[in-house]
Amino acid sequence: MAIPDYARLYLALYKRQVPLRRESVYVLFSLKNFFYRYKIRIFALYFKDMRIISGSHRGKQLIAPKNLPVRPTTDFAKESLFNILNNYFYLDSIKVLDLFAGTGNISYEFGSRGCPDITAVDSHAGCVQYIHKTATALSYPIEVIKSDAFTFLERNLSSYDVIFADPPYDLPEQDLERLVSLVFERNLLAPDGLLIIEHSAKISMEENPYFDHDRRYGGTAFSLFNNV
């Protein structure tokens, strides 16, 4: 993908590759506003940026450290996900578990929409630190736990209305099935709850006995599971 000169300038300023004088700061913020206004997301190739879509912090931009090993859910897929959730729950009265939380992208969206009880789990220390810092700054009720997702499920005793998992897209299919099994065998989902797994659209989980349906958006799929 060819990057226009103005985008190269933005990236150079953002990454401090050119002197950051007063006029440079003006250009930096002007270009940033231009990119977001017209949805030109070239710099998203270089920085892990997020946008809170709705709720108390609607439209707020968050930029995570670029060295975090994550792949944030896209705005389009995230908006579609929460449209689904709004048909099932009052988000201001549910208990949520966010597995493979990464930058905390999904947890922040729940927090902005008034969810009172959110647990975010990730095994990467940098991700855990970033989520804790951001949740504190935004005053979101997010408990952040550093743990492997499977270990957490094996040891946890609580149940949740929504369990969302966004594992790496290259996670073997048998591990995706294991994740579903742990949730239901250990009764970690409330009776009317939903388990949602984000995964590559190349994978189908419809043979799982707890599978309800899936939604596909480009290369992303959300598989929904419930108590049957």
Feature map (PLM): residue ranges:
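Short hydrophobic targeting helices and cationic amphipathic motifs
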Residues: 6, 11, 34-37
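N-terminal amphipathic/hydrophobic targeting modules at extreme N-termini
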Residues: 10-19, 23, 41
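Residue-level detector of transmembrane insertion/anchoring sites
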Residues: 5, 13, 22-23, 68, ...
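Class I S-adenosyl-L-methionine-dependent methyltransferase catalytic core
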Residues: 26, 31-228
